[in-house]
Each structure stands twice: as C-alpha cells, then as structure tokens.
Amino acid sequence: MKVLIVKTSSMGDVIHTFPAVEDARLNRPDVSFDWCVEEAFAGIVALHPAIDRIHTVAIRRWRKALLDGGTWREATALRRILRECRYDLVIEAQGLLKSALVARQAGAPIAGFDRSSAREPSATLFYDATYTVPRDLHAIERTRRLFGLALGYQPDLSALDSGIVPPAGDIAGISGRTAFLLHGTSREDKKWPAEDWIETARLLVEREMTPVTTWSNEREKAVAEAIAGAVPSTILVPKSPLAEIAAIIGHSTLIIGADTGLTHLASAFGLPTVAVFLATEPGLTGPRGQYASTLLAAPGERVTPAKVMAETEKLLALKLRAPA
C-alpha cells in the first residue's frame, strides 16, 4: 500500500506528525509513505527513515505571485508528479483548506478529520473518508489517532517515539556540556525578553555549561549578539542551513527554547528541553517527550531565568538516572 501524507507546515506541526508515522511503521509494515510539505521544511521531513519520497510545495511563495507563469508551472508539475505516483491513499493530516486542495491533486482517496475535528471544516468537502478526533487533545495525539483510524490499527498512546535521531553535521568547535538557547520565534508575544536570555546564559556558565545560540534574521541576530556580548563564553553560531542547526541541537546537552519549531525538534530528539510559553496553550501544541517540560506564564506573573534553571536541573537529573 502506498500512502501520501499531506502536512505542509509549520515546522512544529510537521514534527508533531512524526510519532504517527512511527506508529504506522510499526503497525503497518506493508505501507510505504511519501510526504508533501512546504519546501522550507523538506529537510525536517527527511529526518524520518520511514519517508521514501518528499514532494515540496511553495504555497507561501506562490501566494505572493499568483499571476506569475512560473507559479502555475510549478503547481502543474506537482499535480503531474503526484498523479504519476499512483497513491492508494492520501492522509490529509492538517485539516486546512489549503492542504486539502494539495491532497486533491494526487487523484487518490483522501482520509482526514471530520467537520467537528478539522481546523477548517470546509476542508472536509474534499475528503473521501472522515474521522472524529476530539479537538481538545494534543496535536500529537490527534494525529496519531487519525493515522490509526485511517490505516486500521490502535496506536499505543502510553508510549511516544518520534522515530528520528539527530543528523550528522558540522559541529566543529562545539563540545562538552552545551545548552542551546533558541530565542527566535515568529510572534512578538512569544518572545522572552533578551535580558532574561542573558541572565539564563550567565546561570548556565555558573553551572559549568556553555551557552550556544544562533539566529535566522536580523532581529534575532541582535538578540544573539546581545547574549554573546554579555556572556563572552557563549558560542555564537552564524545563520546556517536548517540541517546544520538540527545537528548542533541534536548534540547539545540541554535545550532552552521559546515556542518555536526547533524547540519541538529538540524534544522529538529526546533531549532535555525546557520550553518557555508566553502566549499559547502548551496543552494542545507544546513539546512532548520524556525529558520535555513547558513553563507557562501565568496571568500577572512571569517566567524567570531562575524558574527555567530549576526546571533544567530536574530534567538533567532525570536524564542522568535513565538507563543507558
């Protein structure tokens, strides 16, 4: 059986789909999987060994050039390639109109959430089989349940395995006990203040750990340079391809991150990960894993560096006690 997964974005949503793929790999060894994803996240999808072929879309870029002939040539080529693959089933795991339209291009039966479960009920008009999955569950569990219903097995929800390992990469000059500080995030209301990141870096050095940080745009660069300027032992990694950053994250001792896709990647690798959530509900989309913890800003309170460090110490102690 040949199945196409459609989960185009965001990075966190893509990573939240990995446990469902791992369930399916174990329960349905007769099924092969391809994946259709935004071009920016193809390298993330490639981390899972069960994915045979990756098809990329560029919906974000296409929207900015709808009248451009190149846009329509790319979209037409994608439709042709998907149909040539002759899929037996498409699992549309995003529940959005845009992803449903992408799924439709494959010309195969589509399975997805029903109207009460999909994020955009109009997407279900394009599905051939729909399944009820409560919306108040975490995104990881919702996707695992959907895959199980679509492929005919019961996932073991008492266990969680993303099925991915850190990639090999250039981590020259980065060794010892390191803590990667993932301060960058797409929304202003998700950003922990720069002074808190600086104080966290200082506290890490006091505990004989080396802070590591990086950036992906000019605003993030200013924060990264502020951390490195205030705490000189910080390793400042220049803006780098996603695969290289993933390799450095994967070989870190500890991750402290904002609500951002790379924080989810760290928890999927099984690393001690402390996420600082300031604006979103972690019960539905927060990092999950044996060594993942989320600190949520309560009304009228703030997440302090001291609270973050206390949480990191708990996770590191838990990891130390774990069997090899």
Segments (PLM) and residue ranges:
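Catalytic machinery of carbohydrate-active enzymes
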Residues: 1-324
